[in-house]
């Protein structure tokens, strides 16, 4: 089963938030941190998701896995590094 992946990447002078497989941005922000916060919100809402944040060079600088415990509703976040 594929886990949805929400990605933050640079687009001109803004940061766009998209989901893997989409060719358009769901939202755009002037600040990277605002885009990451929005992406994290999408990940929590979808219950099981990955958030990837790219840096200015297009390299993944942040990767987090969000999972929701179905019994308690607690959201767990695991940061991954390459």
Stretches found by the model and what they are:
Residues 24-27, 59-61:
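Short, surface-exposed beta-strand/loop "edge" segments at domain boundaries and coil↔beta transitions
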Residues 2-4, 59-82:
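A cross-kingdom feature marking charged/low-complexity
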Residues 9-11, 53, 78-80:
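Compositionally biased, intrinsically disordered low-complexity segments
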Residues 29-50:
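A short, charged, amphipathic alpha-helix used as a generic interaction element across diverse proteins
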Residues 48-61:
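Charge-dense, low-complexity polyampholytic segments
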Residues 2-26:
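Short aromatic-glycine-(Arg/Gly/Cys) micro-motifs in beta-strand/loop hairpins
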Residues 27-30, 72-74:
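A short, polar/proline- and glycine-enriched secondary-structure boundary/capping micro-motif
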Residues 20, 54, 65:
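Surface loops and adjacent helix of pleckstrin homology
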């Amino acid at each position: 089963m594929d886990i949805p992946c929400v990605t933050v990447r640079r687009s001109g002078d803004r940061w766009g938030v998209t989901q893997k497989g989409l060719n358009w941005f769901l939202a755009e922000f002037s600040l990277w941190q605002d885009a990451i916060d929005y992406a994290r919100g999408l990940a929590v809402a979808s219950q099981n998701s990955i958030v990837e944040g790219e840096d200015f060079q297009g390299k993944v600088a942040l990767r987090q896995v969000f999972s929701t415990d179905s019994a308690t509703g607690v959201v767990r976040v695991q940061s991954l590094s390459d």
